[in-house]
Curated annotation (Swiss-Prot):
Family according to the record: Belongs to the HHV-1 UL24 protein family.
Purpose of the protein: May play a role in the dispersal of host nucleolin from the nucleolus throughout the nucleus leading to a decrease in ribosome biogenesis.
Organism: Gallid herpesvirus 2 (strain Chicken/Md5/ATCC VR-987)
Gene Ontology biological-process entries: symbiont-mediated arrest of host cell cycle during G2/M transition
Protein name (record): Protein UL24 homolog
Amino acid sequence: MSSEMPLPTTIVAPTCSMGEKNVLKRYRRQVSSTRNFKRHVNTNVLRKRRLAAGVRCHDRFYKRLYAEAMCLGSQVYDWPGRSFAKIFGKVMVLDVFKQLTDFRLVFEVNLERRRPDCICMFKLPRDLWEVGCDGVCVILELKTCKFSRNLKTRSKHEQRLTGIKQLLDSKSLIGQIAPQGSDCIVICPMLVFVARRKLSVLHVMCLKKRHIVTDFHRLCSILATASDYKARITDTHKILKRHNTNTIHIQRRSGKASANVTDLRNHIACNKTATLSFSNNQERTGGTAMRNMANIIARLVQRP
């Protein structure tokens, strides 16, 4: 056996003709273009989904803020809700809200160039909050966040810059459309970050205030006229489908016929008969369901 080592063999790359090379180039070009197209489509779909999720979150937060504001104006509740307190507590002490003489809340006000999410108008006794101040105009710009743990991400930084620019423009536009008057109003722009899932207020950022002299009630009328959104608490219930409107449980759960069920029970307990007067809309939409429900309750009451 010889001690000489065999020489290493060189591996020659396989050769292919020009036609095969062109076929490979064409295939790679098609694959890369398909991948880019899919990536572009996925980006557009994600952008649309994020936009739709933000719109839904805005709508839900509008209803919550509206409900808490209505509780503030009622005589039953002496303290505002959590979101209301966390936002407007940055502007003034919450005890001041108990002495409000007027309160207006409008959503999505169309100011031509800008469209602030929410504008709150507070009418106060003079010198209660600040010297010479008759009212406060709070401009809210909402930014929804899917992930609420870290507020220093690049996307939230972009949201912060965009929101600040929107608030500054809205502040100047309100100063331009404000009519002449004798009320000293303080404009307070505020940027609010809201969790998309739980609707909790994550962070509130207050910008520089501005004092204007205008008429409070006329300014409220102008802003209410320019609003493109009307808060309706009655829209919080889901619309019942035709195939499941015949059960009392679903009627109760939706809250659509709770008052009618209570009145019906009281009437049956007294007269042992089931009679209900429906409006035209109830006859057209829920007449059959209500008649079936009346028959069921009448049978339950007649049992020994």
